[in-house]
UniProtKB/Swiss-Prot annotation:
Domain of life: Viruses
Name of the protein in question: Uncharacterized 34.7 kDa protein
One Pfam family here: Arif-1
Protein source organism: Orgyia pseudotsugata multicapsid polyhedrosis virus
């Protein structure tokens, strides 16, 4: 019972980690098609450059997703054929490399959490967090401009700019409205996302250890020998049963043919009395039954 519980819990861990990495991987792939799903990080330089981290996430998480699918298909094939896992150097290397790459992705997310908390953006998720300008699913970066203190039109009409007292304004060109310290998916869920990333790292380490242990296990020779002996014993038993059945059939056929060819005076020691008539009647009935047996070749 304990073995089944451990197997079920390990299967749940594999499924949970695969689901998390698959969600992030699919999101990263969608970011290559449209920028609304991109994981953007704005740098605090003079030009406020923006880098798209979705390509890096797809590169690091993709091998793990593909390796996990291949691993599951391999395990199902072994279970279907009734075979055991064998020690495979290439399988161990691929599994370890996939887990290390995926774990490094979550580790980078934790290490650069201060920058991500301040300047990280996922436009489609940010629009779900804020209560204003939900139609603008983009982030083109901050553009710093100067304005004069008497230029009231520049201050009042530009809703996509944030104004400061030092006569500077920061604008986002693709947005219709920008506010001070507006909520994003990263600054509103920093603790939960950090704990989720740390949990993913721990699960990667544990699952990698379990899979390495499975691939390192050599087949049990004693068990294989026992199974082979059992199969040979069953085959010998089936062969003996078939031979016994064929022998019984031959004996029955020979007995039937001998009974058919017996003469009427099979009992010469009997006199012509009522006992002889009874014996003759029995022989006649026996011959009659023998005629009903279908002729078969020996």
């Amino acid at each position: 019972m304990l073995v089944q519980v451990n197997y079920f819990l390990q299967l749940v861990l594999h499924a949970a980690l695969f689901g998390l990495c698959s969600f992030a991987f699919v999101f990263a792939l969608m970011a290559t098609v449209t920028a609304r799903y991109a994981f953007l990080l704005e740098l605090e330089d003079s030009a406020h450059s923006i880098i798209n981290l979705s390509h890096l996430a797809a590169f690091l998480l993709g091998p793990y997703v593909l390796a996990t699918i291949t691993w599951a298909m391999y395990k199902m094939l072994l279970c279907y054929k009734g075979l055991e896992m064998r020690s495979n150097f290439y399988m161990k290397t691929v599994v370890a490399l996939a887990h290390l790459m995926a774990g490094s992705c979550w580790l980078l997310f934790v290490v650069f959490q201060p920058q991500i908390h301040k300047n990280g953006h996922v436009p489609v998720l940010d629009a779900l967090i804020r209560h204003h300008d939900r139609q603008s699913l983009c982030w083109s970066g901050v553009v710093v401009q100067e304005y004069e203190v008497h230029d009231a039109n520049a201050i009042r009409t530009d809703l996509n700019c944030v104004y400061y007292d030092n006569f500077m304004k920061k604008c986002v060109g693709c947005r219709m409205e920008v506010r001070h310290d507006e909520p994003t998916v990263f600054n509103q869920n920093q603790g939960a996302l950090t704990m989720l990333a740390l949990l993913a790292i721990v699960m990667h380490c544990w699952n990698m250890y379990v899979q390495q242990k499975e691939t390192r296990r050599k087949p049990n020779r004693a068990r294989n020998i026992t199974n082979t002996l059992l199969m040979e014993t069953e085959k010998e038993y089936d062969t003996a049963e078939e031979e016994e059945h064929e022998s019984n059939m031959r004996s029955w056929i020979l007995s039937a043919r001998r009974a058919r060819n017996r003469p009427h005076n099979y009992f010469p020691f009997c006199r012509q009395t009522g006992q002889t008539q009874n014996v003759s009647r029995l022989i006649f009935q026996h011959k009659r039954r023998a005629r009903q047996v279908p002729p078969t070749a020996e």
